[in-house]
């Protein structure tokens, strides 16, 4: 039986404080909203307000690049 936080085995992405870095392996399909994802390899979804789009290499609100006048959350 796979570990519940092993996204690669279970094919379910768990973005939760209940998943520590131990045994938690997320693939590219794992996208979490916010900084609550404790899994290594999880991609954080970057959302920009309005019709703005995030720049490349965005890993979270702190490194989110949006068009001028747009805020990231």
UniProtKB/Swiss-Prot annotation:
Coiled coil: none annotated. Cd(2+) 4 binds at residues 46, 58, 64, 72. Cd(2+) 5 binds at residues 48, 52, 54, 58. Induction: By cadmium. Cd(2+) 3 binds at residues 26, 30, 32, 42. Cd(2+) 2 binds at residues 19, 24, 39, 42. Keywords: Cadmium, Metal-binding, Metal-thiolate cluster. Cd(2+) 1 binds at residues 15, 19, 32, 37. GO terms for molecular function: metal ion binding. It comes from the Eukaryota. Cd(2+) 6 binds at residues 54, 66, 70, 72. Belongs to the metallothionein superfamily. Type 2 family. The metallothioneins are involved in the cellular sequestration of toxic metal ions. Monomer. This is Metallothionein 10-II.
């Amino acid at each position: 039986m796979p570990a519940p936080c092993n996204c690669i085995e279970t094919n379910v992405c768990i973005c939760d404080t209940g998943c520590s870095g131990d045994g938690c392996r997320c693939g590219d399909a794992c996208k979490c909203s916010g900084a609550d994802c404790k899994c290594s390899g999880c991609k954080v979804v970057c959302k920009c307000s309005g019709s703005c789009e995030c720049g490349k290499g965005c890993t979270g609100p702190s490194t989110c690049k949006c068009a001028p006048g747009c805020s990231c959350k």
